[in-house]
């Protein structure tokens, strides 16, 4: 059944004060990598707190198709990996559904194997460019046997007999490209080097070291990172407790800031500094966000967040902050809609190649609901209305349903918006929220949100 046939609209209405304690699902980036590295490592890997959304499950299914043994026992996932260099050729195509991270990282992981692998995805993923990952793989000797024009899925790869290590400078701020090259380096003799001018989320580096990879990072005087990985070493299974996803935490967090009288606590949130751009920006806007019980879990910083309703003010978000909050701009734009003055977001070119053209999807949704905003090539300026006065769907019969374009973050962001606008906000489809945050509806309504 297609997404279109199964579309489930949803409407959010002005809510009473939100209150209570919530725990968001496990971090998506760490969950994908836990399945991948556990499936590749020798011995047993045990994972608690894994995000059981559709995207991560697709990565798990791909690893199983290549020889890993993965099962759930109670609240824990137990994996017996193949050993580095010992993945098997899958019998059929690897279907990644909507999972951009899973597909791009797996292309890196298996691309340097002397075997044929085909990658397919849903309509949204099949429209996303994969050339940025295929380009360094081609340099390592990987053949792209089949691809849809524009390096889009379906894509069939065949690795070389012996892959060549490369030094690759990542041309854009992309953790996915960096990670794909490092993972390709795992099955490549010698040392593969990635040069990263702008630091992006560093879960791949941290976790590979935890699994025993010979990986080192040097930062030069200009702040450029050089990441070295020695191929064909042994990876050993680990025990992983996945912290809460800061991108998912952004939704209840912004909801509490904009719904008057709210006071909530979000527990066990990942506080890795490459992921806290939204938190920092909302604090600069005047958001009352207290960081409680900061602690270290499995090499990552974790904390609880107490969030209270706040009168927000517009700010200019520095463009260099974009990599640390690239997935959070839609919900930041919602917060900005209730702030006094203008919020300017720049350096957003990566939003054009996400699950949807996320920048235009946000701008169109805001305008439909009465928000004064200006969309640039790589920027968005939002002029807010404190209290949400006059915002929300127009009652005069015009269809103001927000088109989510099969994008889970657009869907959740606009449902958050409707909790504080004068009039309700409706989205065309909530079905794809399950890709990253299956518990979203239950968690939000449990805090008091009016969403149906």
Curated annotation (Swiss-Prot):
Enzyme class: transferase
Pathway noted in the entry: Metabolic intermediate biosynthesis; chorismate biosynthesis; chorismate from D-erythrose 4-phosphate and phosphoenolpyruvate: step 6/7
Known catalytic reactions: 3-phosphoshikimate + phosphoenolpyruvate = 5-O-(1-carboxyvinyl)-3-phosphoshikimate + phosphate
Binding site for phosphoenolpyruvate: 28, 100, 128, 176, 358, 409
Renumbered residue ranges of the record's region Disordered: 1-26
A GO term from the CC aspect: cytoplasm
Comp. bias regions, Low complexity: 1-17
Keywords: Amino-acid biosynthesis, Aromatic amino acid biosynthesis, Cytoplasm, Transferase
GO MF entries: 3-phosphoshikimate 1-carboxyvinyltransferase activity
E.C. number(s) listed in UniProt: 2.5.1.19
Residues where 3-phosphoshikimate binds: 28-29, 33, 174, 176, 327, 354
InterPro entries per UniProt: Enolpyruvate_Tfrase_dom, Enolpyruvate_Tfrase_sf, EPSP_synthase, EPSP_synthase_CS, RNA3'P_cycl/enolpyr_Trfase_a/b
GO biological process: amino acid biosynthetic process; aromatic amino acid family biosynthetic process; chorismate biosynthetic process
Localization, UniProt: Cytoplasm
HAMAP family the record matches: EPSP_synth (MF_00210)
Record text on subunit structure and interactions: Monomer.
Role, per record: Catalyzes the transfer of the enolpyruvyl moiety of phosphoenolpyruvate (PEP) to the 5-hydroxyl of shikimate-3-phosphate (S3P) to produce enolpyruvyl shikimate-3-phosphate and inorganic phosphate.
Family under the similarity heading: Belongs to the EPSP synthase family.
Xref: PANTHER family: AROM/DEHYDROQUINATE SYNTHASE, PENTAFUNCTIONAL AROM POLYPEPTIDE
Protein name, as recorded: 3-phosphoshikimate 1-carboxyvinyltransferase
Annotated source species: Mesorhizobium japonicum (strain LMG 29417 / CECT 9101 / MAFF 303099) (Mesorhizobium loti (strain MAFF 303099))
Lineage: Bacteria, Pseudomonadati, Pseudomonadota, Alphaproteobacteria, Hyphomicrobiales
Gene name, Swiss-Prot/TrEMBL: aroA
């Amino acid at each position: 059944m297609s997404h279109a046939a199964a579309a489930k609209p949803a409407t959010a209405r002005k809510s009473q004060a939100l209150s209570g304690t919530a725990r968001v699902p496990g971090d998506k980036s760490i969950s994908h990598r836990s399945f991948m590295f556990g499936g590749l490592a020798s011995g047993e890997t045990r994972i608690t707190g894994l995000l059981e959304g559709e995207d991560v499950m697709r990565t798990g299914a791909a690893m199983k198709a290549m020889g890993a043994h993965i099962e759930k026992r109670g609240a824990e996932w137990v994996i017996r990996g193949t050993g580095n260099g010992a993945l098997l050729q899958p019998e059929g195509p690897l279907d990644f559904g909507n999972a951009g991270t899973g597909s791009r990282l797996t292309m890196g992981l298996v691309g340097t194997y002397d075997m044929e692998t085909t990658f397919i995805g849903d309509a949204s993923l099949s429209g996303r460019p994969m050339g940025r990952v295929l380009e360094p793989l081609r340099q390592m000797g990987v053949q792209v046997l089949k691809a849809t024009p524009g390096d889009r899925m379906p894509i069939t790869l065949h690795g070389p007999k012996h892959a060549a290590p490369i030094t690759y400078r990542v041309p854009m701020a992309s953790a996915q490209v960096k990670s794909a090259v490092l993972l390709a380096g795992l099955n490549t003799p010698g040392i593969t080097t990635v040069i990263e001018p702008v630091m992006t989320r560093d879960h791949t580096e941290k976790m590979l070291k935890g699994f025993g990879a010979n990986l080192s990072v040097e930062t030069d005087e200009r702040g450029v990172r050089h990441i070295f990985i020695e191929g064909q070493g042994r990876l050993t299974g680990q025990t992983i407790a996945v912290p809460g996803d800061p991108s998912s935490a952004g939704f209840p967090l912004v909801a509490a800031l904009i719904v008057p009288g709210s006071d909530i606590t979000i527990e066990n949130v990942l506080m890795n500094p490459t992921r806290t751009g939204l938190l920092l920006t909302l604090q600069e806007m005047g958001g009352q966000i207290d960081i409680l019980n900061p602690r270290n879990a499995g090499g990552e910083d974790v904390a609880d967040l107490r969030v209270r309703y706040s009168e927000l003010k517009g700010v200019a978000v520095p463009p260099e902050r974009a990599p640390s909050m690239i997935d959070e701009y839609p919900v930041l734009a919602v917060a900005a809609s209730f702030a006094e003055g203008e919020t300017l977001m720049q350096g957003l070119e990566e939003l054009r190649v996400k699950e949807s053209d996320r920048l235009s999807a946000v701008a169109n949704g805001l305008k439909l609901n009465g928000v004064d905003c200006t969309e640039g090539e790589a920027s968005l300026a939002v002029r807010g209305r404190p209290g949400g006065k006059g915002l929300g769907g127009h009652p005069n019969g015009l269809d103001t349903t927000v088109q989510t374009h099969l994008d889970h973050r657009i869907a959740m962001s606009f449902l958050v918006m409707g909790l504080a606008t004068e009039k309700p906000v409706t989205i065309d489809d909530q079905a794809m929220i399950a890709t990253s945050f299956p518990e979203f509806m239950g968690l939000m309504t449990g805090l008091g949100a009016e969403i149906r």
